[in-house]
């Protein structure tokens, strides 16, 4: 079976007054219909820029190289007119901040209906009915009444439900969720994750979940890609990454999760800071922060498969972390 999305050798670069920044460096992954990929890592690791590259939404100073094939069609450098046909209809995105992603001057109903009128050619009455139906699907109370309200009249969780409804209106085959639970309290986060799981099953939608919240990833994702400084550090199933991580960075992220059943007096952290992308360290970008770094790490390793479906970007032997 051919994957829904096949990304190969993806690079994203930005020209700045100080030089060229490589935000995404030789990224490779595949995604099947109805499955969920979690992309995790610290801020600045290239997670969001990967999504923007796929959607054709990079800043004006950004360029993309490589290949991203969606249902047999190359997305990289696709003409804007063709890309506009794919956006919303086949690939949709939930943006990072629900507080600012909605137009404050337009009623919620108008914003939802606009999507269907633009992409599906629906008349006003049909677009209204479909919008109410989707608000019901995302568990919005009194959906019909909410259509006549403005964004400032909604809580953060309700706005996020509106964003999810808007993204799913055209029944896309791929949904990219960029930090969909940012600024939401934990109870609302849990509701949103449950909702996405239900919608995935109902519409067979593939999801790319971009987040630094590992708890979110554990609850919804089938596959996980750990990114650092624009590169893939480790890739595998959620079970492999959470229970059998083999890259020092992945292990550091897992160890840094606070545990209710732990006896530690202090939180575990990864020493140091993420690198400046204009001045990356020689070789492995994580080596200055890695307690296991050797001289060999001054040469960049390659992403290598070592287990069924699991890959890592590290010189250290797997056995060092699996004993």
Predicted regions and their residues:
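Conserved ABC transporter NBD signature motif
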Residues: 64-74
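A short, proline-enriched helix->beta-strand linker immediately N-terminal to the Walker B motif
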Residues: 169-173
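Conserved ABC ATPase "signature" region
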Residues: 74, 125-145, 254
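ABC ATPase NBD coupling module
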Residues: 75-92, 118, 240-245, 275-281
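P-loop NTP-binding/switch modules centered on Walker-like glycine-rich loops
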Residues: 57, 176-180, 184-265
């Amino acid at each position: 079976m051919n994957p829904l999305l096949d990304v190969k050798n993806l690079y994203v670069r930005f020209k700045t007054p100080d030089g060229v920044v490589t935000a995404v460096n030789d990224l490779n992954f595949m995604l099947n219909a109805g499955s969920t990929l979690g992309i995790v890592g610290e801020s600045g690791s290239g997670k969001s820029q990967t999504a923007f590259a796929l959607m054709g939404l990079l800043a004006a100073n950004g360029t993309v190289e490589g290949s991203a094939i969606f249902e047999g069609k190359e997305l990289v450098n696709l003409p804007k007119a063709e890309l506009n046909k794919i956006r919303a209809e086949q690939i949709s995105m939930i943006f990072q901040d629900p507080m600012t992603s909605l137009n404050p001057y337009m009623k919620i109903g108008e914003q939802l209906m606009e999507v269907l009128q633009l992409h599906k050619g629906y008349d006003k009455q049909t677009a209204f009915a479909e919008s109410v139906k989707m608000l019901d699907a995302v568990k919005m109370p009194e959906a019909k009444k909410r259509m006549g309200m403005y964004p400032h009249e909604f809580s953060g969780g309700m706005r996020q439900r509106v964003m999810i409804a808007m993204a799913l209106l055209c029944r896309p085959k791929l949904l990219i969720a960029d930090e969909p639970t940012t600024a939401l309290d934990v109870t609302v986060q849990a509701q949103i994750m449950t909702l996405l799981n239900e919608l995935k099953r109902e519409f067979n939608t593939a999801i790319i979940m971009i987040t630094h919240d590992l708890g979110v990833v554990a609850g919804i994702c089938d596959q996980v890609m750990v990114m650092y400084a624009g590169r893939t550090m480790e890739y595998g199933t959620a079970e492999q990454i959470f229970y059998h991580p083999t890259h020092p960075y992945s292990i550091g992220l897992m160890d840094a999760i606070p545990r209710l059943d732990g006896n530690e007096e202090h939180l575990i952290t990864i020493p140091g800071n993420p690198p400046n992308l204009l001045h990356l360290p020689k070789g492995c970008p994580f080596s200055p922060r890695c307690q296991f770094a050797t001289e060999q790490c001054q040469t960049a390793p390659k992403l290598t498969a070592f287990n069924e479906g699991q890959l890592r970007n590290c010189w250290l032997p797997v056995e060092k972390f699996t004993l």
